[in-house]
Amino acid sequence: FNLPNERNREITVDQIHKKQECMIKAAALMKDSGFAGVDLHAAHWGYLLDNFLMPIANHREDEYGGCLENRVRVITEMVEGIHQVCGSDFAVTIGLGVKSFITALNKGSLTGENEAGRTVEEAIEIAKLLEKAGVNAILADVGIYDSFYHACPPGYMPKGHALDLYAQVKEQVGIPVL
């Protein structure tokens, strides 16, 4: 379901905090159930938390918009909250799209030229901020729904077509990039 000409209303700060609380509670339930960690579907494919990260989607003028640190804040606060409640030995991993492959909203790009979403350079800076917040590993990915053929490549695309992008991120952080 996609209505390209309609924009969603901006989520309120109270709603952001409620989302963070729910994610932290879910992580605590997982820990209580015997899990060793949690993977946050947080920073790829154009989902809610990914939209906070991308300036093309995030037009906020508060503490969750503008500069990169502000745009990452919704996730770093969540990660810090999970470690506070579950302990530092409870692993937190995050999926991170290292390149969006879009030229505009609703316009994918096969080549990645004229990137309007996330660039690998920005992904590196995001990865550094996530590592600093306590993320234990990054699950690297590329593409969003507008460039689905990168996120779930068809058989004619070369195997490992984005490995060089993942390697660029790995070179800049001290946590595993998977």
Enumerate the predicted regions with their spans:
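Flavin-dependent oxidoreductase catalytic cores
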Residues: F1-L178
